[in-house]
Amino acid sequence: MNNSLENTISFEEYIRVKARSVPQHRMKEFLDSLASKGPEALQEFQQTATTTMVYQQGGNCIYTDSTEVAGSLLELACPVTTSVQPQTQQEQQIQVQQPQQVQVQVQVQQSPQQVSAQLSPQLTVHQPTEQPIQVQVQIQGQAPQSAAPSIQTPSLQSPSPSQLQAAQIQVQHVQAAQQIQAAEIPEEHIPHQQIQAQLVAGQSLAGGQQIQIQTVGALSPPPSQQGSPREGERRVGTASVLQPVKKRKVDMPITVSYAISGQPVATVLAIPQGQQQSYVSLRPDLLTVDSAHLYSATGTITSPTGETWTIPVYSAQPRGDPQQQSITHIAIPQEAYNAVHVSGSPTALAAVKLEDDKEKMVGTTSVVKNSHEEVVQTLANSLFPAQFMNGNIHIPVAVQAVAGTYQNTAQTVHIWDPQQQPQQQTPQEQTPPPQQQQQQLQVTCSAQTVQVAEVEPQSQPQPSPELLLPNSLKPEEGLEVWKNWAQTKNAELEKDAQNRLAPIGRRQLLRFQEDLISSAVAELNYGLCLMTREARNGEGEPYDPDVLYYIFLCIQKYLFENGRVDDIFSDLYYVRFTEWLHEVLKDVQPRVTPLGYVLPSHVTEEMLWECKQLGAHSPSTLLTTLMFFNTKYFLLKTVDQHMKLAFSKVLRQTKKNPSNPKDKSTSIRYLKALGIHQTGQKVTDDMYAEQTENPENPLRCPIKLYDFYLFKCPQSVKGRNDTFYLTPEPVVAPNSPIWYSVQPISREQMGQMLTRILVIREIQEAIAVANASTMH
């Protein structure tokens, strides 16, 4: 396409515009020529900048052509569907020897009801001399509306025992009676269209291996094209490029072209060195594409040897219905792969047939809105890496999604073993259900498959029930569980009472109140005990221990919020409940998935602060808080370790900031593993475990709570070296100077407190980090 800016812009701006059309691999040559030749370099690069090129990178020859997209240089290629099929009579062979002959035939048949265009290229390559390439265009129809020109172009030929088989591109669309012009066809006269392309190419290698390339692509216009009177015009060659829905003309590199309306498709293939000159490109020179169509997903595959493969998946759509367009480009590095299989479609269909009749598209379930499949099999010398041949290695796959304004469809990427012959999938295998709204990236190496599911960016991901972890307590959930259990239990009691004789004295049947607030202490204690064993979720399954503990914390918060002062975890009236709960929680270990991931607990530290199980609300709560901090920071995980803790072994230390003497920091320290240190050994700072201040929240500061605990303890026990946790007084006033007796708590009581602490998520994480650091 001629540049129309030469006479309207400055020379420097013209150079910048011209540089954007120079391919990246020729940019250095362009700059050197510009410095030496001056304006003559612009004329030299004027013709080569917009033509297709083949250059070598690594072991492959890359087919490239410059394309200007929204004012920047971008090599844009959209995939077409490919699959491997046996050779048919319609496919024409290409024998590689040093003579080469290429014939391209274009036939367009037209009737008042249907217009079909069939392009059937045959490539025959022999390796000794030069023969011309013939391009024949034949147009047949019931009305004299087209012509059939013929073009001959020179071509180089080269010998080889290889053979390229194939290529058949069929383009069909149904429309009302109209004329087909060699220049363009208005889209408003074509409500529906269908494109079916097949490209098969094969080459017999030295070892007898046969590799074939076949492409099949089908596309249909969005509904906006069907209903609007003027949506624009498009022109397309045999390998065409996605363009926005607006009127545009594109110059073809050859003089004879035909135009159809619809959504074209282009592909980029890796061409072997021996066939660089035998590839004929019919792609338009220049196009303009809406830059709003960006990427949808990127897959990165890293092999055990450190090789990284990046699989960018580009999804581009016109300004039509986003649900009716899905075009994908898969780019694979050239170094370490042999075959790539790409398929994507929102509905199920194997043989792609898009009927342009409105009624058929609405009424026929076998018609798809968009379906494509692509197999790109390289013929280069570098095959699949040797470490992937056995198919028994692990391939980590990372998928990153970028939200877009379109609806994603299922996409699958298969990387096959080079020794395996690709097989065409059945309709059920290659297309997921229409309701599926996920992208799947599946990498297969012989016997091993790694699959990563990516949720559609438009919809919020629905995590599994195991990952629905609450961040705070919800009292209504605890009340709901209690009501459901009470209703079930009351029904069981009534059923049992009907089967038994009435007791002497006509005692009233036991019934549990569904309202927690009106329940008596004894009834609530008994009901909570039974709930530890009988509570069930909506599916009739028993709750996990940490979930059950979470429910009881919700009940505790509900009681506090509604005026009840009962502490079901520390009051003497609920001792039986705490014993039953201890039996449920004592054997709890962090749950690990089959892949080795640790599932976090439902209970968090924040939840205990919410329901007043941590803090200085009561003597029992303060004692539990100190045990929590000692477990979290001193990493005391067993009852024996806590029993060894003593007032004399916990040191309070204050440090001054050297730069600012008024800035002081206070901490409490505990000598770790006191028994393993030898007598007379010098004690260093790394031998101590430390708890530091929390100046942001004094009510949750370990140092201030420790000082408050010392303040409430009897003076006679503050220097003891055999105890740290004292027994709370049963009844005390908040302003009482003494909250604890001189007796230490029992081992059983300490075990129950520690069991509930070890279920907390932050405690489990701290222990896991400490264990991981000791292993290293």
From Swiss-Prot:
One GO term of the biological process aspect: PERK-mediated unfolded protein response
Residues the record lists as N-acetylmethionine modifications: M1
Induction note: Regulated at the translational level via an alternative ribosome re-initiation mechanism in response to various stress such as endoplasmic reticulum stress or oxidative stress. In the absence of stress, ribosomes re-initiate translation at an inhibitory upstream open reading frames (uORFs) of the QRICH1 transcript, which preclude QRICH1 translation. In response to stress and subsequent EIF2S1/eIF-2-alpha phosphorylation, ribosomes bypass the inhibitory uORFs and re-initiate translation at the QRICH1 coding sequence. Positive autoregulation at the transcriptional level.
GO cellular component, one term: nucleus
Modification type Phosphoserine: residues: S345, S464
Compartment(s) where it occurs, according to its Swiss-Prot or TrEMBL record: Nucleus; Cytoplasm; Cell membrane
Region (Disordered), start-end ranges: 139-164, 218-240, 419-441
Comment text on domains: The CARD domain may be involved in the regulation of caspase activity in the context of programmed cell death.
Stated name of the protein: Transcriptional regulator QRICH1
Source taxonomy: Eukaryota, Metazoa, Chordata, Craniata, Vertebrata
